[in-house]
Amino acid sequence: MAGLVAAARARELGAGVGLFEKGDRPGGSMLLSSGVVWRYRDFDEFRRQCPDGDEPLQRLIWERLDEALDWLEGLGVAGSPHTTNPLTTGRRFDPGSLTGALVRAAGEVELGRSSPDEDGPLVVATGGYPVRLAGGRGLLVRSNPWSEGEGIDLALARGAAEAPSDEFYGRAMPGPVPEEHFVAASQLYGRFARRVNDIGEEFFPAEVSWSENDLAQAIAAQAGGRAWYELGAEALTRPEVAAKLPYAQQTEPLRGGGLRVRVYAAVTHTYGGVRVDTRARAADGVWVAGVDAGGVSNGGYASGLAQALVLGLAAAEDACQ
């Protein structure tokens, strides 16, 4: 998303843009997402939820998102208010329609090519390194298959500084699923379950966060990056559970009633990356946007699409000055 946003905004400002996409289609992981672009309603809540994140970047995203959403709708794609979470506010877009609108505004996308040959001004926006992180830790991938971190490597080679983190945004999944099921198949009901590992230890007895991202990372730390959700009879009646159980791939009945469901940690995007300022500038002639920019959500969870949208705009605007 961030690369398309940056290209669209740069063209709007009169710049000539070369847009390179490593994959065989535009849209990156945005196309596989729920399409909700959101922020916390209150900035202090943002800080409470993501206490280890870069505060100036957090404030930039929080302050600019609403006008950025208006800009996005100005491209001809309609969003609907997203109000189901009392902590957050945002808009939901159809991912396919959003991708199409951004591609039309961004111009020609050269597919199958990850970077230009020349060393001119460059905006890097490649979706972080979820594939690399998942492969190194034996976890499932819940992102596009191309985000391996080469964009971050390129920015670092051109003088950028690293913003390291081993955190990620992910979900508990029932096992490998087709990418079109990444959202629907997420086993997002761990707060109603007893969470145990393969030797029966309850590894996460604490209260689970609203996003369950903390639980996904705790599952990743278990042997094999997997765990069991043990659900009692009452939990099985909850609509949040009933909607997700059809996607379960391995279940076992519990003695005395109930069910346990096998889950695996899956990585959507990483939190580490390149250090940027509030103009998305990483080095002389290099801007980094989206989740290639590290350090925004550390210690919690915030919208990766909001980060992509705001930093994509900031990168284009600064690069075009």
PLM regions and their residue ranges:
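Glycine-rich loop(s) and the adjacent beta-strand/alpha-helix scaffold that form part
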Residues: 124-175, 305, 311-314
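Conserved N-terminal/central alpha/beta ligand/cofactor-binding core
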Residues: 22-107, 194-209, 243
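A glycine-rich dinucleotide-binding beta-alpha-beta segment and adjacent secondary-structure elements
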Residues: 247-299
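An anion/pyrophosphate-binding glycine-rich loop and adjacent beta-alpha core
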Residues: 158-252
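Catalytic phosphate/nucleotide-handling subdomain of diverse soluble enzymes
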Residues: 284-321
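Short hydrophobic core segments
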Residues: 20, 119-129, 286-288, 312
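Helical element adjacent to the flavin cofactor pocket in flavoenzyme catalytic cores
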Residues: 90-117, 150-158
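N-terminal Rossmann-like FAD-binding beta1-loop-alpha1 element of flavoenzymes
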Residues: 1-19, 315-316, 320
